[in-house]
Amino acid sequence: MSKYKILDSHIHLYSLANIPLLHWDEGNPLHGNRRLDEYIENSQSTQFDVEGVVWIECDAKIDLTQGLKGLENPIEEYLYICRNINGKLLPEEGVSTPFKRRLIKAMIPFAPMPLGSAGVEEYVKALKTRNSSEFHLVKGFRYLIQDKPPLTISDPHFVSSFQWLDSNGYVFDLGIDMRSGGLWQFKETLEVFKKVPNLKYIINHLTKPCLDFDPETIDSNPDFLSWKRLVTEMYITTPNSYMKLSGGFSEVEQDVALDVTSTSRHVYPWFKVVYELWGPERTIFASNWPVCAIPAGQNLTEKWFQVCETLFDSIGMDEDTRRKIYYSNAFKAYNI
């Protein structure tokens, strides 16, 4: 069998030079250089080749009360990624090579969704003004929901931002969190999905489920059953959505994260539900590097690949379907 090609649909990138834009101060395990240099070094395998990545914004520091003036950090973050693509990296930002310049296939910057459609449009125009030559790789936007208070996503301004993205052909990377947030996030999200059903939502990390639930008794767990009902409704409501098979290492206990077999066992019940919904055409692989490398350690992409292979083996998935999930489905999801 030939090696699999991978389009890693969820990685974060930053250097020590621009880490002040982010929340990861010294002492945070994510502090440091997390550039394409480090990603490539930690994504080697005899079983696959990473042929592309989708860059996802890092939740930069912002001040929405200042309008566009309070959004300089995510704009600078976008410009850093543009320098990775055009080969004009600053000395402390890494070493540019032809391979690295073509590795980023799509960009998903931050968008100020609570500011409404007018605020998002003004911000997107600012991105284009600051760098237009690489803007064609901006395929959508993200604004993390997982750590926000109730009623954030259901606010009329937020809904109008979704409508603007839909009208302009962008995707939205959706980050909600069952384990640390709660099922109320799913209920609010579902209500918004009903208002803007046709936007292409890319749902992150299997919805960050409670992977500490006992897999042996999970089928009778009321929270698992409620989650299953809600994600089923979410799937039915959004005909253009995709699900990322990613993020598992961050949701299990540390001792589990260090063992591929144990991680696979805890992920399986949740994977089975979402795969029966989104299926072989709308499921996409992602490593969530470097976030998931904190619990899993070095060679994250290889380890998560092994988890996925175990999951795929458990349902008898054929090789052609695996190739879709690892590679070609992400091209469709992100309009690449």
Curated annotation (Swiss-Prot):
Keyword Transcription regulation recorded: no
First-tier enzyme category under EC: hydrolase
UniProt keyword terms in alphabetical order: Hydrolase, Metal-binding, Rhamnose metabolism
GO biological process: rhamnose catabolic process
GO molecular function: hydrolase activity; L-rhamnono-1,4-lactonase activity; metal ion binding
Coiled coil (UniProt feature): none
Catalysed reactions, semicolon-separated: L-rhamnono-1,4-lactone + H2O = L-rhamnonate + H(+)
KW Hydrolase (keyword) present: yes
Regulation of activity: Inhibited by Zn(2+), Fe(2+) and Cu(2+), but not by EDTA.
EC number: 3.1.1.65
Gene3D superfamilies with a match to the protein in the record: Metal-dependent hydrolases
Cofactor mode of binding and number, as noted: Divalent metal cation.
Pfam families (alphabetical): Amidohydro_2
Cofactor: a divalent metal cation
Function: Hydrolase with high substrate specificity for L-rhamnono-1,4-lactone. Catalyzes the second step in an alternative pathway for rhamnose utilization that does not involve phosphorylated intermediates.
Family label: Belongs to the metallo-dependent hydrolases superfamily.
UniProt miscellaneous comment: Part of gene cluster that contains the genes for this rhamnose catabolic pathway.
Identification of the protein by name: L-rhamnono-gamma-lactonase
